[in-house]
């Protein structure tokens, strides 16, 4: 092989050039003799180069040449070389100096120290260690300190890096490590071995190590640890966490992780703290509405209402005023309607007076809305709203607007639900309210369902409704919806009423045979 350096197109020396030739060049330039062991082999192993030998003259040592030799032998990491840090395996770093080095050896390589560079080497080593510690602190804050899937890392906590760190600081660094998933974990949470569990210290250390309590509460992993602290925490712990979260509690209520923290914290709060929460939540009514509209925010508001009901009754008027001012908006939202339902369930009619007035005055607008329709049906349920006065007031408003509601795609369900309550007094009021309009309702797609529902009730006199239908019998026999009402009236009526219906059917039988809806009646009744 030609004893010359070969240079490729990138300006790098060919890896087949011998280290011996390079060492000879170095020796010639520095007027120093090479040790015999370095001349005895054509390809030198890195271990033969990494030792401290006083035979080397510090003034003659060329770190750049030695590094280029290692790179030529493919023992240097090109990525690290670009950053100015030559790399060797971790166990070889410890042969050079006592410090740093992890499973991938992200430490610093120092040249063999001679008498000339002895103090300079110590200063450089101390500077690099300080830089390494500072880098670790910055990496932890920026969450850039990571392990790969096989446990490799920069090794900041391994070997003898902490030898020069005082015990207190060393423990402060070691208490937090980063697992293979990139999430910071506190050792004190994983095990109680060798330490006394203290909630205050744990809560304080979490905030100091991870950031503010707000950041902890919104983190997928740390929020669970914060929940554990709240669950078993003392009053001092709860106060500390509450002070850290109260400012951003509106944002936490709609956060997927912070929501659970807030709900658990509200259950542990004192009456004074609940007052502060009410102050913050109701300060901006638009924020309050957005929380109620949110699928998880509405749950937090319901938990707050429960806590107010149990431990802060003096705050009921304040929270009810806030809810009543936006009640119409809340009733029309699929999530916020449960806030209204929770108020009717927990509070008395006197406490809900203003809210009940708002809902009653806008009963028709609420009933013709899809979500409002569902809300009213749930309000009629005795189990959901035990207060009879509230239920009776809402039912009365529905009966008052029954005619218009029967003609609506959503409102007709509210009227049918009132019928299904099977309250004789309320049913009689509804039947009388719709008199002289049954023929009109029977020709409507939605109203026909209400008329059929009333005809099937056993507690009322169906003859009253059938007689009212006879006012428009000629059109009903040929109507797409009215024909179903006539069929139902036939089957639920007694014989005397059927004879009346038969008379009108036979009078219009020719027209009915020419109409597909009239034919349905004839086929169904076998006429």
From Swiss-Prot:
Pumilio repeats lie at residues 205-243, 244-279, 283-321, 322-357, 358-396, 397-432, 433-468, 469-503. Keywords: Cytoplasm, Repeat, RNA-binding, Translation regulation. The keyword Repeat applies. Coiled coil: none annotated. It holds the Pfam family PUF. This is Putative pumilio homolog 13. Sequence-specific RNA-binding protein that regulates translation and mRNA stability by binding the 3'-UTR of target mRNAs. GO terms for cellular component: cytoplasm.
């Amino acid at each position: 092989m030609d004893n010359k350096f070969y240079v490729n197109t990138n300006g790098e020396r060919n890896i087949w050039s011998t280290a011996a030739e390079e060492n000879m060049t170095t020796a010639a330039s520095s007027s120093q003799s090479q040790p015999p062991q370095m001349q005895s082999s054509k390809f030198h192993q890195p271990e033969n180069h990494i030792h401290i030998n006083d035979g080397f003259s510090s003034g003659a040592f060329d770190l750049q040449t030695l590094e280029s030799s290692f790179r030529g032998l493919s023992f240097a990491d090109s990525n690290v070389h670009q950053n100015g840090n030559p790399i060797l395996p971790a166990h070889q770093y410890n042969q050079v100096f006592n410090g740093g080095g992890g499973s991938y050896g992200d430490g610093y390589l120092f040249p063999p120290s001679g008498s000339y560079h002895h103090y300079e080497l110590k200063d450089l080593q101390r500077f690099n260690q300080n830089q390494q510690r500072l880098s670790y602190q910055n990496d932890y804050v920026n969450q850039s300190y990571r392990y790969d899937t096989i446990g490799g890392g920069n090794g900041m906590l391994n070997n003898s890096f902490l030898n020069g760190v005082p015990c207190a600081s060393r423990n402060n660094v070691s208490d937090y490590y980063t697992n293979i998933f990139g999430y910071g974990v506190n050792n004190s949470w994983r095990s109680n071995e060798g330490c006394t569990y203290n909630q205050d210290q744990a809560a304080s250390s979490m905030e100091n190590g991870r950031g503010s309590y707000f950041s902890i509460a919104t983190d997928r992993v740390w929020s669970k640890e914060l929940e554990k602290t709240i669950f078993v925490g003392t009053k001092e712990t709860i106060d500390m966490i509450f002070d850290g979260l109260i400012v951003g509690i509106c944002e936490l209520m709609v956060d997927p992780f912070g929501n659970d923290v807030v709900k658990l914290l509200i259950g542990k709060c004192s009456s004074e703290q609940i007052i502060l929460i009410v102050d913050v939540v109701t300060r901006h009514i638009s924020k309050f509405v957005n929380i109620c509209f949110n699928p998880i925010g509405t749950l937090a508001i319901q938990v707050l209402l429960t806590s107010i009901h149990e431990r802060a009754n003096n705050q009921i008027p304040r929270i009810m005023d806030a809810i009543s001012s936006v009640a119409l908006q809340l009733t029309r939202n699929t999530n916020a309607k449960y806030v209204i339902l929770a108020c009717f369930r927990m509070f008395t009619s006197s406490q809900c007076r203003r809210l009940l007035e708002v809902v009653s005055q806008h009963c028709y607008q609420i009933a013709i809305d899809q979500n409002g329709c569902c809300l009213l049906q749930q309000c009629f349920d005795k189990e959901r709203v035990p207060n009879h006065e509230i239920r009776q007031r809402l039912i009365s408003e529905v009966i008052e607007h029954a005619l218009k509601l029967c003609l609506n795609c959503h409102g007709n369900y509210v009227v049918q639900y009132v019928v299904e309550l099977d309250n004789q007094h309320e049913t009689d009021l509804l039947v009388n309210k719709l008199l002289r309009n049954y023929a009109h309702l029977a020709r409507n797609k939605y109203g026909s369902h209400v008329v059929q529902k009333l005809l099937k009730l056993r507690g009322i006199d169906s003859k009253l409704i059938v007689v009212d239908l006879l006012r428009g019998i000629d059109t009903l026999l040929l109507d797409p919806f009215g024909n179903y009402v006539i069929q139902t009236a036939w089957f639920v009526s007694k014989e005397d009423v059927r004879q009346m219906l038969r008379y009108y059917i036979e009078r219009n039988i020719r027209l009915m045979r020419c109409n597909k809806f009239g034919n349905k009646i004839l086929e169904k009744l076998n006429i």
